[in-house]
Amino acid sequence: MPLIKFKPTSPGRRSAARVVTPNIHKGSPHAALLEPQSKTGGRNHHGRITVRHIGGGCKQRYRVIDFKRDKEAIPARVERIEYDPNRTAHIALLCYVDGERCYIIAPKGLKEGDKIISGPNVPIKLGNSLPLRNIPVGTTVHAVELKPSKGAQMARSAGSSVQLVAREGVYATLRLRSGEMRRVLAECRATIGEVGNEEHNLRKLGKAGAKRWLGVRPTVRGAAMNPVDHPHGGGEAKSGQGNPHPVTPWGVPTKGYKTRKNKRTQQFIIRGRRG
């Protein structure tokens, strides 16, 4: 997919760069697979901000994605590839031979008219979903489950993929794009191929307003605030943070501070992403 730039008719257009997607469906999404989605502004039921930098944005409807791919041994045809405002990847609308339709994450190279299928013994073909125990070692996959029948949780964003590097007993070893080596149960499902829209990271929004359309509010430095608002705040002129190490607005160390506390799943990580 080519990357295009615009005539510099304004500062925002001068800096913008967009990925051309000629094969994306231009019409409306499939109405039966849409759900309403309300904005929270990053606030909980008490009205307090729990997630910063969220607010505004265009109205969106959620596309119901089939992450389980548990409709086995029934062939499906790709009706079209669509844009999804809720994720970086594109989605594909499938039509099964029994008439049912569903959305899946669109892998790279999948196009309108292709036939795909799910099941334990289906061919190793782009878009097919099957357990890791039946996938050859060395295959690139995406939409990987962490628990059998729970639904895909890994490698779902644009351009992401996972490589199956080994299989031993009831576990399969995966190499993530971050470099992490992780074991998952071989009964977990995965989809053949890598996620499409791999040039998503090359786009440039061009202006702050484009970020606001996405529902993202500005990020303000703590050192630019008052002492009442942030531990880094206050001081004369452009003072530093004044702390031995940088902290969050709630005093928790940040910028390199390790926050992973889940020891239960640590046993499944053979090598961390930091080596």
Curated annotation (Swiss-Prot):
This protein's record includes keyword Lipoprotein: no
GO cellular component: large ribosomal subunit
Pfam families the UniProt entry points to: Ribosomal_L2, Ribosomal_L2_C
Disulphide connectivity of cysteines: none
Chain ranges passing through the membrane: none
Region described as Disordered: 226-261
Highest taxon, organism lineage: Bacteria
Matches recorded under InterPro entries: NA-bd_OB-fold, Rib_uL2_dom2, Ribosomal_uL2, Ribosomal_uL2_bac/org-type, Ribosomal_uL2_C, Ribosomal_uL2_CS, Ribosomal_uL2_dom3, Ribosomal_uL2_RNA-bd_dom
Keywords, sorted A to Z: Ribonucleoprotein, Ribosomal protein, RNA-binding, rRNA-binding
The keyword Oxidoreductase appears for this protein: no
UniProt GO molecular function: rRNA binding; structural constituent of ribosome; transferase activity
Example of a GO biological process term: cytoplasmic translation
NCBIfam families tied to this protein: rplB_bact (TIGR01171)
Function recorded in the entry: One of the primary rRNA binding proteins. Required for association of the 30S and 50S subunits to form the 70S ribosome, for tRNA binding and peptide bond formation. It has been suggested to have peptidyltransferase activity; this is somewhat controversial. Makes several contacts with the 16S rRNA in the 70S ribosome.
Family: Belongs to the universal ribosomal protein uL2 family.
Assembly information from the UniProt record: Part of the 50S ribosomal subunit. Forms a bridge to the 30S subunit in the 70S ribosome.
Identification of the protein by name: Large ribosomal subunit protein uL2
Gene this protein is translated from: rplB
